[in-house]
Amino acid sequence: MADSRDEPLVLGIETSCDETGVGVVRGTTLLADAVASSVDEHARFGGVVPEVASRAHLEAMVPTIDRALKEAGVSARDLDGIAVTAGPGLAGALLVGVSAAKAYAYALGKPLYGVNHLASHICVDQLEHGALPEPTMALLVSGGHSSLLLSTDITSDVRPLGATIDDAAGEAFDKIARVLNLGFPGGPVIDRYAREGDPNAIAFPRGLTGPRDAAYDFSFSGLKTAVARWIEAKRAAGEEVPVRDVSASFQEAVVDVLTRKAVRACKDEGVDHLMIGGGVAANSRLRALAQERCEAAGIRLRVPRPKLCTDNGAMVAALGAEMVARNRAASDWDLSADSSLPVTEPHVPGQGHPHGHPHGHDHVHEVSKENLYS
């Protein structure tokens, strides 16, 4: 991907949901990954509350930026650019990050890059396994997204092949965890219980796997309903619900469909690399089954460490560094948060700034830099 001689130093800000993430990278090398999570504040509601998330971002933003810079051992004045998630995500949460990034970039006189949350989830793998092959097939699975994407250039060309038509995989994990009274978030706890259960104990349905169904689309609403009804029927009959077997059987139904469709997409498109990202990619069974099926199909699997699969600022910085290295246009100062930013737009370029510098270094910038970071 980027020229090895060109390793831009970039700070990335991520606030699309409930994690305030700030990362610093130099090219494809991770220097810092600071995260402040508000997940505990949402747990009692059984899901993410947008207003709570936005307020938490406001409180955590400056301390998390300072922590990332300190962890990286770099000065803000040395940055080559500042990247921020512009979308998709929760509108209010995104706005906090975008506003902070604009303020820092303006004060420091640095180019600003508004980038796509989903494209960032793909690009983060560069920090783990080196430059992304082109093309790369990506399976992104999280609480808000379940998508199959083909990337020939992570900074400019990401093509959606399929997506969920109803619920995302992570959303289904959260729902079933609630029905089983296991708490929130559901992914990690179901993964834990499933390890002691039988994945073949209960035959739960696999959505959109018929011969006439969309080859690369996903559907988890029917599975979610089927599992919930099975549990309710057990309780109504006064029987004990086998939590471990239910967890394992439900989880197997999800990862079976995800991996089957991802491998098929690789074969159909002639791509020999599969990258899996997003919060659900931290699931141990998804990783194991994907590895098994990829090996059988002659496909190389790339999955970042679990900490880089969940939302973080490092992934935003990684994509920002790629934008700088490839001389992509920086964003304008009127960059706005876009809760439905399509993945076909890996970043939000400004108008008329082909070299990525939307402003000059005027007196205001120079004075601001001295005041803030002298």
Swiss-Prot record:
Q: EC number(s) in its UniProt entry?
A: 2.3.1.234
The cofactor named in the record is: Fe(2+)
Pfam family example for this protein? TsaD
Q: Spell out the subcellular localization from the entry.
A: Cytoplasm
**Signal sequence: where?**
none
Protein task: Required for the formation of a threonylcarbamoyl group on adenosine at position 37 (t(6)A37) in tRNAs that read codons beginning with adenine. Is involved in the transfer of the threonylcarbamoyl moiety of threonylcarbamoyl-AMP (TC-AMP) to the N6 group of A37, together with TsaE and TsaB. TsaD likely plays a direct catalytic role in this reaction.
What name does this protein carry? tRNA N6-adenosine threonylcarbamoyltransferase
